């Protein structure tokens, strides 16, 4: 696909209409299902999400097991989206990311782009400097990247006509414990439920409340 063709794939009105249509669904239809082709496209939207350096120090845990989701619900302020949405995605950040993660990424670049590893040495050193900063700074930096993926997921869902709800209202420590994340080297950051809005979700009728563009966007 050419750059011009890609730019014409989604018309401006289509994008704005989709963003106006979407909202943070508070009540899902428990029987609603996302078509397989749309879900596969949404998974691709996660894989293709941008990250700093392209490092991808994240993982996206799709939880379909109903029993497991029932265990997670009490750790989510008993919000019904956890059990009623067709899909539940837990966005994870890599714990203690370091030089080994950089090397893995460099190896992947070399493989995909057929570039000799030695030609990537400068890039590797730059990334290594970033991941060897104090651990709290590295974790904060990588956590911010996860929110980029969340935004990409939500926009993609809107364009596909798939309902979703981003959620920070959950006990991260409890999630990590229930899902056994720490032992696997991961930490939960944010979650997103996706599915079909319930016909009686009152929030669907609410008008969007946004400040005027003139107050939010400045051109200098």
Task: List where the protein language model places each region.
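Acidic, surface-exposed loops and disordered segments
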Residues: 1-220
């Amino acid at each position: 696909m050419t750059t011009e063709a890609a730019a014409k794939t989604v018309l401006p009105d289509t994008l704005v209409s989709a963003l106006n249509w979407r909202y943070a669904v508070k009540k899902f239809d428990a029987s609603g299902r996302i078509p397989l082709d749309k879900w596969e496209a949404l998974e691709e939207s996660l894989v293709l999400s941008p990250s700093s350096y392209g490092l991808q120090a994240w993982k996206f845990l799709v939880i379909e097991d109903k029993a497991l989701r029932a265990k997670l619900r009490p750790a989510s302020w008993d919000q019904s989206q956890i059990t009623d949405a067709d899909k539940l995605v837990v966005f994870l950040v890599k714990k203690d990311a370091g030089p080994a993660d950089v090397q893995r990424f460099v190896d992947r670049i070399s493989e995909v782009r057929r570039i000799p590893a030695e030609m990537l040495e400068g890039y590797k050193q730059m990334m290594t400097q970033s991941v060897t900063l104090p651990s709290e700074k590295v974790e904060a930096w990588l956590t911010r990247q996860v929110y980029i993926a969340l935004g990409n997921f939500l926009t993609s869902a809107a364009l596909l006509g798939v309902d979703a709800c981003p959620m920070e209202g959950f006990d991260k420590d409890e999630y990590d414990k229930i899902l056994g994340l720490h032992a696997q080297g991961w930490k939960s950051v944010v979650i997103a439920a996706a599915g079909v809005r319930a016909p009686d979700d009152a929030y669907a009728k609410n008008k969007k409340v946004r400040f005027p563009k003139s107050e939010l966007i400045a051109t200098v």
